[in-house]
Curated annotation (Swiss-Prot):
GO terms for biological process: protein quality control for misfolded or incompletely synthesized proteins. PANTHER family: ATP-DEPENDENT CLP PROTEASE PROTEOLYTIC SUBUNIT. Gene3D superfamilies: 2-enoyl-CoA Hydratase, Chain A, domain 1 (3.90.226.10). The gene is clpP. Belongs to the peptidase S14 family. It comes from Staphylococcus epidermidis (strain ATCC 35984 / DSM 28319 / BCRC 17069 / CCUG 31568 / BM 3577 / RP62A). Its main location: cytoplasm. It catalyses: Hydrolysis of proteins to small peptides in the presence of ATP and magnesium. alpha-casein is the usual test substrate. In the absence of ATP, only oligopeptides shorter than five residues are hydrolyzed (such as succinyl-Leu-Tyr-|-NHMec, and Leu-Tyr-Leu-|-Tyr-Trp, in which cleavage of the -Tyr-|-Leu- and -Tyr-|-Trp bonds also occurs). Fourteen ClpP subunits assemble into 2 heptameric rings which stack back to back to give a disk-like structure with a central cavity, resembling the structure of eukaryotic proteasomes. This is ATP-dependent Clp protease proteolytic subunit. SUPFAM superfamilies: ClpP/crotonase. Cleaves peptides in various proteins in a process that requires ATP hydrolysis. Has a chymotrypsin-like activity. Plays a major role in the degradation of misfolded proteins. It comes from the Bacteria.
Length: 194
C-alpha cells in the first residue's frame, strides 16, 4: 500500500491540501525514493525543468534513497541535471545504490551530501541477453560501452582514475557516508543540526 501524506496549508485565502511531494516541490525539493525507471525519470526530469522555469538562479535539492534501476532512465535524469542552469544539490538519505549513486555524484561540485548513516553502493551495469549468438554479442558490446561511459563520467565526477573506478565497480562496493566522501562521490557528510 502506497500511503502519501497530505499537508494542509492555511493562508489568508483559506486552506489548501497538498500531497507531501507537491508541498516539498514548492521549496525546490525533489524526492527520488524508489527504483529508477522511465516513469520515475520522466517525473524527476519534469520537476527539474519546472523548477528551472520558476527560477533559474536558485538551487534545487534532490534527495536520494534509491536502489538504482534503469541505466537509460538514470542518464535522462543525469543529463537534465547537467543541462539546466540551477545547481542541483544531491543528498543521500538511506541508500544510494547503483544508478542512485551515479545520480548522487551528478550534483553540483561542492553540493553533494550524505547523512551520517547513509550508504552508497557502486557497481558495474547489470544486463542480460537472449536470442541468437549475434544478438547476444551485440548486447554484450552495448553493455561494455555503457560501462565505459559510466566509468568515464564517475572518474570525472570523483577525481578517481578510470582504472580505479573499473576495479572498484567490478563487484558491489558498499561505502559509508565518510568513505563516499573520501572517494569523491560526495563532498560532505551532513551532521545533525541539533
Amino acid at each position: 500500500m502506497n500511503l502519501i501524506p497530505t499537508v494542509i496549508e492555511t493562508t489568508n485565502r483559506g486552506e489548501r491540501a497538498y500531497d507531501i511531494y507537491s508541498r516539498l516541490l514548492k521549496d525546490r525539493i525533489i524526492m527520488l525514493g524508489s527504483q529508477i525507471d522511465d516513469n520515475v525519470a520522466n517525473s524527476i526530469v519534469s520537476q527539474l525543468l519546472f523548477l528551472q522555469a520558476q527560477d533559474s538562479e536558485k538551487d534545487i535539492y534532490l534527495y536520494i534513497n534509491s536502489p538504482g534501476g534503469s541505466v537509460t532512465a538514470g542518464f535522462a535524469i543525469y543529463d537534465t541535471i547537467q543541462h539546466i542552469k540551477p545547481d542541483v544539490q544531491t543528498i543521500c538519505i538511506g541508500m544510494a545504490a547503483s544508478m542512485g549513486s551515479f545520480l548522487l555524484a551528478a550534483g553540483a561540485k561542492g553540493k553533494r551530501f550524505a547523512l551520517p548513516n547513509a550508504e552508497v553502493m557502486i557497481h558495474q551495469p547489470l544486463g542480460g541477453a537472449q536470442g541468437q549468438a549475434t544478438e547476444i554479442e551485440i548486447a554484450a558490446n552495448h553493455i561494455l560501452k555503457t560501462r565505459e561511459k559510466l566509468n568515464r563520467i564517475l572518474s570525472e565526477r570523483t577525481g578517481q582514475s578510470i582504472e580505479k573506478i573499473q576495479q572498484d565497480t567490478d563487484r558491489d562496493n558498499f561505502l559509508t557516508a565518510a568513505e563516499a566522501k573520501e572517494y569523491g562521490l560526495i563532498d560532505e557528510v551532513m551532521e545533525p543540526e541539533k
